[in-house]
C-alpha cells in the first residue's frame, strides 16, 4: 500500500481511522509516501480497484469520499468532504460535510484540490493545479483540450 514514487519522497504516511468509521478497498490500492489519510468518526472512505495515489496527498473524510476503479492521482493532491474544521453558529455545530464521489478511470493532476460536494464523472481528467469546488458530474469524459475552459470559465 505504500508504494509509488520510489525514492522521491521521504515523508511518513499517516492513515488514521476513527471509531465507527469504514474504509473499503475494492482491490489493489497504492498510497505513496508522505500522504495523510484521515477517516473521522462515522465517515466512509472507499477505494476502487487499482487506485493509485502519488506522494504527499491529503484525504480527509468527515462523511463520505469514494474513488472509482482505476483512479490515478498525482503529487500533492487534497481531497476534502468538509471545511477542515467545525463551524459554530449560535452555539451549535453546523453540518459542513458533503460527499465527494470520483468516478472510474479518472486522472487527477498534481497539486489539484477537490472540495466537498463534488461529483466527478467517469473518465474525467483534472488538470494540474485546479481547485474543483462544485459538482462537475456532468462533464464530458474527454476533459482534455478544448473542454479545459469548462473548469476555468468561472475564474476568468
Which positions does each model-derived feature cover?
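Short basic coil micro-motifs at the edges of alpha-helical modules that engage polyanionic partners
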Residues: 56, 97-99, 117
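Active-site/ligand-binding-proximal alpha/beta "capping" segment
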Residues: 101, 119, 128-129, 133-134
Amino acid at each position: 500500500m505504500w508504494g509509488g514514487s520510489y525514492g522521491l519522497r521521504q515523508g511518513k504516511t499517516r492513515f488514521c481511522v476513527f471509531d465507527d468509521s469504514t474504509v473499503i478497498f475494492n482491490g489493489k490500492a497504492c498510497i505513496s509516501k508522505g500522504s495523510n489519510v484521515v477517516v473521522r468518526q462515522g465517515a466512509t472512505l472507499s477505494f476502487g480497484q487499482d487506485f493509485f495515489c502519488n506522494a504527499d496527498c491529503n484525504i480527509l473524510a468527515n462523511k463520505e469520499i469514494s474513488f472509482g476503479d482505476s483512479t490515478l492521482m498525482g503529487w500533492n493532491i487534497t481531497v476534502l468532504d468538509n471545511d477542515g474544521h467545525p463551524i459554530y453558529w449560535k452555539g451549535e455545530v453546523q453540518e459542513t460535510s458533503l460527499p465527494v464521489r470520483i468516478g472510474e478511470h479518472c486522472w487527477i493532476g498534481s497539486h489539484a484540490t477537490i472540495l466537498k460536494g463534488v461529483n466527478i464523472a467517469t473518465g474525467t481528467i483534472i488538470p494540474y493545479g485546479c481547485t474543483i469546488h462544485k459538482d462537475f458530474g456532468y462533464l464530458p469524459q474527454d476533459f482534455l483540450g478544448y473542454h479545459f475552459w469548462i473548469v476555468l470559465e468561472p475564474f476568468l
